[in-house]
UniProtKB/Swiss-Prot annotation:
Ranges that cross the membrane: 4-24, 30-50, 61-81
Catalytic activity: a quinone + NADH + 5 H(+)(in) = a quinol + NAD(+) + 4 H(+)(out)
Gene3D superfamilies: 1.10.287.3510
InterPro entries, A to Z: NADH_UbQ_OxRdtase_chain4L/K, NUOK/Mnh_C1-like
Alphabetical GO biological process terms: ATP synthesis coupled electron transport
Gene Ontology MF: a single term: NADH:ubiquinone reductase (non-electrogenic) activity
One CC-aspect GO term: plasma membrane
Signal peptide: none
Lineage: Bacteria, Pseudomonadati, Pseudomonadota, Betaproteobacteria, Burkholderiales
UniProt keyword list: Cell inner membrane, Cell membrane, Membrane, NAD, Quinone, Translocase, Transmembrane, Transmembrane helix, Transport, Ubiquinone
Intrachain disulfide bonds: none
Family to which the UniProt record says this protein belongs: Belongs to the complex I subunit 4L family.
Name of the molecule in the record: NADH-quinone oxidoreductase subunit K
Role summary: NDH-1 shuttles electrons from NADH, via FMN and iron-sulfur (Fe-S) centers, to quinones in the respiratory chain. The immediate electron acceptor for the enzyme in this species is believed to be ubiquinone. Couples the redox reaction to proton translocation (for every two electrons transferred, four hydrogen ions are translocated across the cytoplasmic membrane), and thus conserves the redox energy in a proton gradient.
Length: 101
């Protein structure tokens, strides 16, 4: 059986990789969205690990609700990205900072 520390280490590594990905790649909006989703999945892994370790199902149910909200968030983010690409012909973050209402 895999110990709790292994899951927490994996979650910390995934979280750190996503933070590094956000800081290293600030130009591509798709990569930024993927790094944010990876960060959320790392937190969810820690929720599931603690939930299993403590024998409580509340953490796993909470992760289920987080994943449904994250799926809706991803769909909305990608829809906004498609509209921005149609209007500006780019997904470069540096060129999208001057949005007009």
């Amino acid at each position: 059986m895999v110990a709790l520390g292994h899951y927490l280490t994996l979650g910390a590594i995934l979280f750190a990789l996503s933070v590094i990905g956000i800081f290293l790649n600030r130009k591509n909006l798709i990569v930024l969205l993927m790094c944010i989703e990876l960060m959320l999945l790392a937190v969810n892994l820690n929720f599931v690990a603690f939930s299993h370790y403590l024998g409580d199902m509340a953490g796993q149910v909470f992760v289920f609700f987080i994943l449904t909200v994250a799926a809706a968030e991803s769909a909305i983010g990608l829809a906004i990205l498609v509209v921005l690409f149609r209007n500006r012909s780019t997904i470069n973050v540096d060129e999208l900072d001057t949005l007009k209402g």
